Amino acid sequence: MTPLTDRQGKFSPLKATTLALALLPAAVIAYWFFNHQLGPLPVKEALRHVGDWTIRLLVITLALTPLQRLLNYPKIALIRRMLGVTTFAYALTHFLLYIVNSKYDLGFVASEIVLRFYLTIGFVALIGLSLLAATSFDAAVRKLGKKWKMLHRLVYGVAVLGLLHYFIQTKIDVSPAVLMTGFFILLMVYRVFIMKRVSLTPAVLAISAVVACVLTAITEFTWYALATGVDPWRIAQANLMFSFGLRPAVIVLLVGLVPCAFVILRNLRVTEQKQTA
């Protein structure tokens, strides 16, 4: 099975579209870079943008399993491994850009990875993604058998390390890191229900959204309380003051309610079809 074909060897529009969309951010960043649109420190800016998209793609990849269950669309499984490998490619590019930004001084890069905690965990996350990418092909799946699923559960630990790296390296506003963490929390709540074989009913989805919202707010509060000099209570109050824009916890709640609304509308449609049949 190639990146653009399904298990029968036929061209897959779904895989082709997904790959094109996944590579689009890289193409845009490259365009900005070569057209001098990344400011006075283009490599550093490209490094930041690629890192942001690495986390986003990782979260999107983790969202595919619950999305497959919600939509009852098995073909989503076709793009999961491909998107995971693409996420690794972004992570590797992020690391290579860090080397370029360090003037290709590999000794300096190695020492920074050892001495700076956020770089250490970022590098460990990269190693984890490398291992997952190397075993994301059909031959590896067949060879590893049942161990393959166990191995690929490492992705959750990799995500935690990546998000922590994202938090620590953020200099001022950690809202993007909080938002991605909130989405990850939402997906983990879904995973708990799925593991317990609980159906993703509207009530379960609504509960998941509320729980993720609260945990996201707690995460943001805790970070500001422990890692910054900013009053965390001011941040907590901002979650209730929409004049400052939507805070990450609120966005997580709204996004979490979208699947709930989708399932409700789908159930209503099925009921109407049964009544008219």
Question: Model regions: which residues?
Answer:
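Membrane-embedded alpha-helical bundles that constitute the cytochrome b-like, heme-associated redox core
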Residues: 2-277
